[in-house]
Amino acid sequence: MPIDPVALTADLVRCPSVTPEEGGALDLIERILSGAGFDCTRVDRNGVPNLFARWGRKGANRTFGFNGHTDVVPVGDAAAWTRDPFGGEIADGWLWGRGATDMKSGVAAFVAAAVDFVQETPPDGAVVLTITGDEEGDSTDGTVALLDWMAAEGEAMSVCLVGEPTCPERLGEMMKIGRRGSMTAFFTARGVQGHSAYPHRAKNPVAALARLIDRLSSHDLDYGTEHFDASTLAVTTFDTGNPATNVIPALCRATVNIRFNDAHSGASLTRWLEEEAARVAADTGVEIALSAKISGESFLTPPGELSELVARAVEAETGLRPEPSTSGGTSDARFVRAHCPVVEFGLVGKTMHQVDERVEVAQIEPLKAIYLRILKDYFA
């Protein structure tokens, strides 16, 4: 009997799986997949829940993979929600709740498609699902743990589809063939405290750091590349912790976040930031220290067989040819890309992480149909 992806989405939304809690979501998926003949393994690391499921022979020449997550961000002020954030309520043509868009509907649609596919037309190959409970958190023990376990166990995917919401306005208009890299730079400026009436007796870390931030934010990192928009740098914090208006503080901190294309690497940008900080430090006499956190490098799955497979299926079901894009934030595709070619396609993501997150019910069944067509065409 075919699985209803709308009902499954609602059931998953009712699982309060705020990172790092599993909330019953992976248990539910495991029961469904096990009942359909998938070999399921829980790959939990450091208390983080993950699920690996495979239908078909281990080591098959053609193995289609799916990656997704069931963890969700916190609801915030629950009183601000129109409906219960974990109610999975369907009203006015929408399915409401935390994770409805990001990305329990995508997971439900692929689970439903995969079960229908292997039961109706068993493929000559394997279908693998890697579902994590650590995408919205630190992402260190989720998809990374699954891929580590797969490598150790001799499990593999030939290609992978990530079911993140990718469409800005209409189902079918966009897929992701890559992502920008992301890094955060933490600056600490240390000067000499003093009276604001005698600035010559102090070394002002606020002025020095402001100069550095101005240099960074006014610099064009690049003007875009063939498949990527221009890299961006955003100032996200600037703090002194100084309540006194007549005191030049001894310490000032600032943070910038850079989303970068394939013209750069995390290492090359770190070197640039260090050089800029050293210039300002030399000019002002203020010590400026940098600590950089690189969340992921940019990557691209060049347009080809996988992206064309996805595009054809999307166009057949929606009438829209999806634009291949690298825009937006990071996703777990940044980890999968080292394992196999990866493309992302999912629903419209306008309300993800918002109060009253919801997904249009009319999109969920077509998404299942797209995923089912992708599977059929891949193994044809």
UniProtKB/Swiss-Prot annotation:
Molecular function GO terms recorded: acetylornithine deacetylase activity; cobalt ion binding; succinyl-diaminopimelate desuccinylase activity; zinc ion binding
Reaction catalysis annotation: N-succinyl-(2S,6S)-2,6-diaminopimelate + H2O = (2S,6S)-2,6-diaminopimelate + succinate
UniProt keyword annotation of Transmembrane present: no
EC number: 3.5.1.18
Enzyme class: hydrolase
Cofactor note: Binds 2 Zn(2+) or Co(2+) ions per subunit.
Cofactor(s) listed in the protein's UniProt record: Zn(2+); Co(2+)
Function (record text): Catalyzes the hydrolysis of N-succinyl-L,L-diaminopimelic acid (SDAP), forming succinate and LL-2,6-diaminopimelate (DAP), an intermediate involved in the bacterial biosynthesis of lysine and meso-diaminopimelic acid, an essential component of bacterial cell walls.
Protein name (Swiss-Prot/TrEMBL): Succinyl-diaminopimelate desuccinylase
Gene: dapE
